[in-house]
Amino acid sequence: MTRTIMLVPIGKNIGLTTISLSVISAMKRCKFNVKFLKSAIEYSNTNYNIDDTSLILKDTQSLSYINPLIVDFINQFSLKQIKQRIVDYILSKVYAKKEKYDIFLIEGFDTKSHTYVLSNDINYYISKSINVEIVFVCAVDRSSQLDINNIVYIINNVFKKNKNINIRGVIINELCQKVRNDYGNVNLFDMFKSSVKKINFGDVKYDFLFQKNGIEVLGCVPWIHKLMEPSVKILCDKYLGANIIYDRCMNSQYIKTFIIYDTNEDIKNAKKFHRSLLIIPAISNDKIKEICVQINKNKILISAILLTNFLNVHDKCTDFIDQLKIANCTICSTPNDVFTVVSLLHKFNFKLDNKNYQLNIIENDMSRHINLDWIRSLKHSYQYNSICLPSLFIYNLKHLAKKFMKNILLPEGCELRIIKAASICSKNDIAYCTLLGNPKKIKNIAESNNIVLNSNIEIIDPKLIRKNYVERLCHLRRHHGITLAHANELVKDNSILSTLILESKKVDGLVSGSIGTTSSIILPALQLIKTSPGSSLISSVFFMLLSDYVTLYADCAVNINPDATQLAEIAIQSSNTARLFGIFPKVAMLSYATGCSGFGDTVDKVKEATRIVQERSPNLIVDGPIQYDAAINRSVAKLKCPHSLVAGNATVFIFPDLNSGNITYKAVQRSANILSIGPILQGINQPVNDLSRGSSVQDIVYTIAVTVLQSSLSH
């Protein structure tokens, strides 16, 4: 079983690339076959359409990866559309190739130009839309409970609020960032009376602070200063915005450490100052010149000198500037004081490149701070949430339809929405579509609306084939005294003609109803195709794609007032449909009362129907009578029926009659602005599906896909 892990950053500049590479290294050490995907990156004129982690993997050829999706927050789409595009992209890349790898590692979105709240929003949407195991990545630079509490607050209030999200734990990065003071390696934050200590994996304090909130610490990666060595150009010029007084190979000089100059000491120890950025507070010009002389005299290789509180370099004489060059390093200045500079350095995003020695540090040192017990546990199967997620449901619907590619008949061939849907299905290989109607009229409608009708869309003129089905109709209805003349009249109805075409098995399924009535679809199906073995009735079900999961509503379109036996059959049919589409059925037999709290004919009918379901399908999880709020909401369920296996977790909702079912499905669909697919017909020998007259093109496409799957999977 392929495990799908997503690293979700909490905050900005947390060293996500470092952690991703460390986790990859730990996984490879445990002999896992890993595939990497960065979810998305922001469009930029300066980037190369690839993220930092993928770029390193590309340059080192160390791991298979997939290029990220490029998103443009300024010029393209709404945020909602962007989030859905990212989810669709991940699904198309990950789920199509999952079986080839042991682990799919997804790196969450981290914004460079917006607040990290945007990253949280996008990563939350991804997390709740696809079945992944979430590992949070955060940086705790100052060992304070306040800092950790803020991270825990975000996890609890942004991510944990959704019951679908699989949270595995957290990896903490950059625990011990150091800025070295002269002589003694004093931690910078000690200067400001902050107690930062080095914390190794499994530190009791970190374990306690996270685990008391139900979050397991999967790694504590200490700061390793030699890993991140920015160039003088990157750090001083681009990041700090310092004024460059003297440039000596800024691009090729790298900063190994930072040193705040101590006026009470001389610069003699070459080892301590080697490749450092020497930060000099406000002192006299003579003292600055003296420092440069000492650097030259003691042959110390300093990367750069940064003069703080340096207001205007142009006020200094040229001779003074020339005298500084004796230090043989880049000289720069800033009007900021030492404290401001240090604060900026603290926030600097040290960016990895593909230097071999940096990658060796990650592989040989940093990756060992990832909990290998967790990594090894990934070889075992993992029970993801059984809830069917909307985005995953749609992906599987289209993916499986492409796999089977059945021929679906659309008798309302001259309807614009039908023509558009057929074109989309053809373009995306969802189905072969056959349009019934006047070919010239259909082609004119398509042309005037810029719709492409591919060669695999067949158009049949019903006038040319009606006579072919007269005898068959007479045979099928022979016990009802049908005459040849009457049959000739009946086949002029496209609903009857299309049902006869399906019955002859020249097509695999039938979708109609965008301009017709439900009865005009169901009656010919009942008369000519008949109910499936073991079924005494045809019922309907709607797939309701709520914000966080998919449920089934039945019967909302066919049976007006079913009795207890019929209601039980509808429940069993609906549970079978749920299984067919990968949804684990937990059936709620709905009523206005829960358990024994109410009385009346409807309650009694639902009680009896529940008993019949339990008798006929003893392995089916079913409960009733139960109210809608108790069936769908866990909090209400705990109060009204705490011992129910269905309450709060129902996936199949059976309404007592058509009145309540039809009203509820339309109220939920319109009020919550959700997608519903249906009515999907059940209990029939061959797939026939009805469309609501208000169906959108998208609704029709999905109904066609469902019909393809019914035709394929039911056998």
From Swiss-Prot:
It comes from the Bacteria. Its EC number is 2.3.1.8. One of its GO terms (cellular component) is cytoplasm. Residues 392-715 are annotated as: Phosphate acetyltransferase. NCBIfam families: PRK05632.1, PRK09653.1, pta. Its main location: cytoplasm. Keywords: Acyltransferase, Cytoplasm, Transferase. Homohexamer. GO terms for biological process: acetyl-CoA biosynthetic process. It is an enzyme of class 2 (transferase). Gene3D superfamilies: 3.40.50.10950, HprK N-terminal domain-like, Isocitrate/Isopropylmalate dehydrogenase-like. It is found in: Cytoplasm. It comes from Buchnera aphidicola subsp. Baizongia pistaciae (strain Bp). The keyword RNA-binding does not apply. This is Phosphate acetyltransferase. GO terms for molecular function: phosphate acetyltransferase activity. It holds the Pfam family PTA_PTB. The N-terminal region seems to be important for proper quaternary structure. The C-terminal region contains the substrate-binding site. Pathway: Metabolic intermediate biosynthesis; acetyl-CoA biosynthesis; acetyl-CoA from acetate: step 2/2. Involved in acetate metabolism.
